[in-house]
Amino acid sequence: DLLAKELIKVMDGQIENVYYKSETTLPYKSETDKEDGYLIGSANEADFIAIENGLKFKADWIKGQKTGFFVDQRDNRALLEHYAKDKDVLNMFCYTGGFSFYAMRGGAKSVTSVDSSAKAIELTKENVELNFPGDTRHKAEATDAFKFLDDMKDGEYDLIILDPPAFAKHRDVLKRALNGYKKLNAKAFEKIRKGGILFTFSCSQA
Protein backbone atom coordinates (compact mmCIF):
# COMPACT_ATOMS: atom_id res chain seq x y z
CA ASP A 1 0.00 0.00 0.00
CA LEU A 2 2.83 2.40 0.85
CA LEU A 3 4.59 1.67 -2.45
CA ALA A 4 1.36 2.25 -4.38
CA LYS A 5 0.88 5.63 -2.74
CA GLU A 6 4.47 6.61 -3.50
CA LEU A 7 4.00 5.62 -7.15
CA ILE A 8 0.96 7.87 -7.39
CA LYS A 9 2.95 10.72 -5.86
CA VAL A 10 6.05 10.27 -8.04
CA MET A 11 4.05 9.91 -11.27
CA ASP A 12 2.16 13.12 -10.45
CA GLY A 13 -1.32 12.06 -11.50
CA GLN A 14 -0.31 9.88 -14.46
CA ILE A 15 -1.40 6.70 -12.62
CA GLU A 16 -5.07 6.09 -11.89
CA ASN A 17 -4.95 2.46 -10.73
CA VAL A 18 -2.48 0.16 -9.00
CA TYR A 19 -3.32 -3.55 -9.02
CA TYR A 20 -1.52 -6.06 -6.78
CA LYS A 21 -1.12 -9.52 -8.29
CA SER A 22 0.96 -12.40 -6.94
CA GLU A 23 -1.29 -15.37 -6.09
CA THR A 24 -1.62 -16.47 -9.71
CA THR A 25 1.83 -15.42 -10.91
CA LEU A 26 4.31 -16.73 -8.34
CA PRO A 27 5.36 -20.40 -8.08
CA TYR A 28 5.15 -20.05 -4.30
CA LYS A 29 2.87 -18.43 -1.73
CA SER A 30 3.72 -14.80 -1.05
CA GLU A 31 4.90 -14.11 2.51
CA THR A 32 2.41 -11.25 2.76
CA ASP A 33 -0.55 -13.59 2.11
CA LYS A 34 -2.18 -10.56 0.52
CA GLU A 35 -5.00 -11.28 -1.91
CA ASP A 36 -4.83 -9.99 -5.46
CA GLY A 37 -6.74 -6.75 -5.90
CA TYR A 38 -6.67 -3.00 -6.40
CA LEU A 39 -4.47 -1.00 -4.04
CA ILE A 40 -5.46 2.26 -5.70
CA GLY A 41 -8.55 2.83 -7.84
CA SER A 42 -11.02 0.19 -8.99
CA ALA A 43 -12.06 -1.87 -11.99
CA ASN A 44 -12.98 0.04 -15.12
CA GLU A 45 -15.46 -1.31 -17.64
CA ALA A 46 -13.40 0.11 -20.50
CA ASP A 47 -10.82 -2.21 -22.04
CA PHE A 48 -7.32 -1.71 -20.70
CA ILE A 49 -5.01 -0.87 -23.58
CA ALA A 50 -1.23 -0.87 -23.29
CA ILE A 51 0.67 1.40 -25.69
CA GLU A 52 4.21 0.32 -26.54
CA ASN A 53 6.32 2.08 -29.17
CA GLY A 54 3.18 3.30 -30.90
CA LEU A 55 1.42 -0.09 -30.99
CA LYS A 56 -1.73 -0.79 -28.96
CA PHE A 57 -2.44 -3.99 -27.05
CA LYS A 58 -5.65 -5.03 -25.34
CA ALA A 59 -4.70 -6.77 -22.11
CA ASP A 60 -6.38 -8.24 -19.04
CA TRP A 61 -4.28 -7.63 -15.94
CA ILE A 62 -6.81 -9.34 -13.68
CA LYS A 63 -7.63 -12.62 -15.45
CA GLY A 64 -4.84 -12.70 -18.02
CA GLN A 65 -1.58 -14.64 -17.75
CA LYS A 66 0.69 -13.06 -15.14
CA THR A 67 0.34 -9.28 -15.60
CA GLY A 68 -1.64 -9.60 -18.84
CA PHE A 69 1.11 -8.08 -20.98
CA PHE A 70 4.81 -8.98 -20.91
CA VAL A 71 6.69 -5.67 -20.88
CA ASP A 72 10.01 -7.49 -20.31
CA GLN A 73 9.96 -8.46 -24.00
CA ARG A 74 9.69 -4.87 -25.23
CA ASP A 75 13.29 -4.61 -26.49
CA ASN A 76 13.13 -8.04 -28.14
CA ARG A 77 9.92 -7.13 -29.95
CA ALA A 78 11.54 -3.94 -31.23
CA LEU A 79 14.60 -5.92 -32.35
CA LEU A 80 12.46 -8.40 -34.25
CA GLU A 81 10.81 -5.56 -36.18
CA HIS A 82 14.15 -4.81 -37.86
CA TYR A 83 14.48 -8.41 -39.14
CA ALA A 84 10.90 -8.87 -40.37
CA LYS A 85 10.87 -7.11 -43.73
CA ASP A 86 9.65 -9.40 -46.54
CA LYS A 87 9.78 -12.41 -44.18
CA ASP A 88 7.20 -15.13 -43.56
CA VAL A 89 6.93 -15.00 -39.77
CA LEU A 90 5.66 -17.63 -37.33
CA ASN A 91 4.89 -16.48 -33.77
CA MET A 92 4.48 -19.53 -31.54
CA PHE A 93 2.84 -19.21 -28.10
CA CYS A 94 1.72 -15.77 -29.29
CA TYR A 95 -0.61 -14.93 -26.36
CA THR A 96 -1.80 -11.36 -27.16
CA GLY A 97 0.27 -11.24 -30.35
CA GLY A 98 3.01 -8.80 -29.34
CA PHE A 99 5.74 -10.11 -31.62
CA SER A 100 3.26 -10.50 -34.48
CA PHE A 101 2.39 -6.81 -34.63
CA TYR A 102 6.00 -5.68 -34.56
CA ALA A 103 6.67 -8.07 -37.44
CA MET A 104 3.74 -6.64 -39.38
CA ARG A 105 4.91 -3.09 -38.82
CA GLY A 106 8.38 -4.15 -39.87
CA GLY A 107 7.08 -5.13 -43.29
CA ALA A 108 6.65 -8.90 -42.94
CA LYS A 109 5.23 -10.64 -45.99
CA SER A 110 3.00 -12.83 -43.80
CA VAL A 111 2.54 -13.45 -40.07
CA THR A 112 1.05 -16.54 -38.43
CA SER A 113 0.17 -16.45 -34.72
CA VAL A 114 -0.27 -19.75 -32.86
CA ASP A 115 -1.43 -20.40 -29.29
CA SER A 116 -3.19 -23.31 -27.59
CA SER A 117 -5.61 -20.86 -25.93
CA ALA A 118 -8.63 -19.95 -28.04
CA LYS A 119 -9.14 -16.91 -25.81
CA ALA A 120 -5.58 -15.72 -26.51
CA ILE A 121 -6.12 -16.14 -30.25
CA GLU A 122 -9.31 -14.08 -30.10
CA LEU A 123 -7.43 -11.35 -28.23
CA THR A 124 -4.67 -11.48 -30.85
CA LYS A 125 -7.23 -11.02 -33.63
CA GLU A 126 -8.73 -8.05 -31.79
CA ASN A 127 -5.28 -6.52 -31.45
CA VAL A 128 -4.61 -7.00 -35.17
CA GLU A 129 -7.75 -5.01 -35.96
CA LEU A 130 -6.74 -2.40 -33.40
CA ASN A 131 -3.39 -1.81 -35.10
CA PHE A 132 -3.80 -3.02 -38.70
CA PRO A 133 -7.52 -3.03 -39.56
CA GLY A 134 -8.31 -5.16 -42.58
CA ASP A 135 -4.70 -6.36 -43.01
CA THR A 136 -4.79 -9.76 -44.72
CA ARG A 137 -1.15 -10.64 -43.99
CA HIS A 138 -2.08 -12.07 -40.58
CA LYS A 139 -3.67 -15.39 -39.72
CA ALA A 140 -4.11 -17.03 -36.34
CA GLU A 141 -4.64 -20.59 -35.18
CA ALA A 142 -5.58 -22.07 -31.80
CA THR A 143 -3.68 -25.35 -31.62
CA ASP A 144 -0.90 -27.19 -29.81
CA ALA A 145 2.52 -25.77 -30.68
CA PHE A 146 4.30 -29.11 -31.01
CA LYS A 147 1.56 -30.44 -33.29
CA PHE A 148 1.69 -27.30 -35.42
CA LEU A 149 5.45 -27.62 -35.87
CA ASP A 150 5.15 -31.31 -36.69
CA ASP A 151 2.44 -30.72 -39.29
CA MET A 152 3.88 -27.65 -41.05
CA LYS A 153 5.95 -27.93 -44.22
CA ASP A 154 9.73 -27.57 -44.13
CA GLY A 155 10.91 -24.10 -45.10
CA GLU A 156 7.48 -22.49 -44.80
CA TYR A 157 8.75 -19.70 -42.52
CA ASP A 158 12.03 -17.81 -42.43
CA LEU A 159 11.53 -16.15 -39.03
CA ILE A 160 10.20 -18.13 -36.07
CA ILE A 161 9.53 -16.90 -32.52
CA LEU A 162 9.39 -19.41 -29.66
CA ASP A 163 8.21 -17.83 -26.41
CA PRO A 164 6.61 -20.70 -24.47
CA PRO A 165 5.15 -20.54 -20.96
CA ALA A 166 7.35 -21.82 -18.16
CA PHE A 167 8.14 -25.51 -18.61
CA ALA A 168 9.67 -25.64 -15.11
CA LYS A 169 8.51 -23.66 -12.09
CA HIS A 170 10.19 -26.07 -9.66
CA ARG A 171 13.53 -27.90 -9.79
CA ASP A 172 11.91 -31.32 -9.53
CA VAL A 173 10.66 -31.01 -13.13
CA LEU A 174 13.81 -29.36 -14.50
CA LYS A 175 15.03 -32.40 -16.46
CA ARG A 176 11.69 -32.87 -18.18
CA ALA A 177 11.55 -29.15 -18.95
CA LEU A 178 15.02 -29.18 -20.52
CA ASN A 179 13.97 -32.06 -22.76
CA GLY A 180 10.90 -30.07 -23.76
CA TYR A 181 12.97 -27.01 -24.70
CA LYS A 182 15.42 -29.17 -26.67
CA LYS A 183 12.61 -30.85 -28.59
CA LEU A 184 10.88 -27.55 -29.33
CA ASN A 185 13.98 -25.74 -30.56
CA ALA A 186 15.27 -28.73 -32.53
CA LYS A 187 11.94 -28.96 -34.34
CA ALA A 188 12.03 -25.24 -35.15
CA PHE A 189 15.56 -25.53 -36.57
CA GLU A 190 14.42 -28.53 -38.60
CA LYS A 191 11.46 -26.67 -40.08
CA ILE A 192 12.81 -23.14 -40.58
CA ARG A 193 13.71 -21.93 -44.06
CA LYS A 194 17.41 -22.11 -44.95
CA GLY A 195 19.16 -18.97 -43.71
CA GLY A 196 16.23 -18.18 -41.42
CA ILE A 197 16.23 -16.55 -37.99
CA LEU A 198 15.02 -18.09 -34.73
CA PHE A 199 14.05 -15.94 -31.74
CA THR A 200 13.81 -18.29 -28.74
CA PHE A 201 13.07 -17.53 -25.08
CA SER A 202 12.56 -19.27 -21.74
CA CYS A 203 10.78 -17.90 -18.67
CA SER A 204 11.30 -21.00 -16.50
CA GLN A 205 12.30 -20.12 -12.94
CA ALA A 206 13.82 -23.43 -11.82
What are these model-derived regions, one by one?
Residues 2-69:
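Non-catalytic substrate-recognition/targeting regions of SAM-dependent transferases
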Residues 42-206:
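Rossmann-like S-adenosyl-L-methionine
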